[in-house]
Each structure stands twice: as structure tokens, then as C-alpha cells.
């Protein structure tokens, strides 16, 4: 190969790489499995006193009906920003609400002094997991493939992400 052919091959390789990165950015994912949207895990700190919740218990928790884990350990809800797969799953499966209904629910709940604030909005799975690690009592929904060491995945109806019966897909 001549040096001119080497340069052309390098340019073509870079062009292909740029095209792949652009495609990944447009789909919002670098993995076909993530682009399709996989299981969503409920994560807490290891010392949070919960291992397994029924779907109705998760619903009560994220509706703000349960504000303490035990004693004085307050529940801090962390939820992904609109348009994320995790938020879509949570709104459909847990809240059973549309985006406008969700916003109105929390405005009403805070206005009636039934909650001091709504869930905290997080903009990525990594932001959610970092905050769960930093805030005692916090709980979040994240892509099950992105759970870091140091967090515990809560079983839902006795199942974990990846199980065919797992409800948060």
C-alpha cells in the first residue's frame, strides 16, 4: 500500500466511525439493546431497609403515600426527566398517568401539603445512581444494565430485572 492509499483508508475508517457515532447520538444509545429499552431497576443504598416490594407498594412509595422507610429515614424520590425510557416505564406501569397528569398530581399533592415536594428530577442514569449513593433513603429507577457496584436492586414481586416475570419493562 502506498502512503496515499494509507491516508485514504484512514479517512474512510474515520468516516465510518463518525457515521456510527452520529447514528448512536441520533438514537440516544450506543447499544441496540439500550435503544430498544430494557428492564428498569429500582435501586437503593445497601443500608436502606427494603429487599422486595409488591408493585402496589412501589406505587404507594412513588406516589408519595409512604414518606419514611423506617423511623426517621425519609424517602427521597428520584425520577428521570421526561422523554427517557425509564420515566416512560414508571409513568405507564407505576403511576398509570400521562406526563401532564403526573405533573398535576404532584402540584396538587404539594399544594394540599400532603408532600413537601415532588420527586427530584435527574437527567441521566449515572446522575440517578450517584445521588442514590449520596442521599440516605433515596430511591430511583435506572436502566438495569447501568446499576453500579454499591447499590442494591430491589426485587419487585419477588423478581429481579432480566426475569421474564419482571414487571418494569
Kindly give the residue locations of the regions a language model identified.
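N-terminal secretory signal peptides that target proteins for export/translocation
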Residues: 1-13
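Extreme N-terminus of proteins, especially the signal/transit-peptide cleavage junction
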Residues: 10-13, 33-38
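Bacterial N-terminal signal peptides
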Residues: 16-29
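Exported/periplasmic ABC-transporter solute-binding proteins
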Residues: 35-169
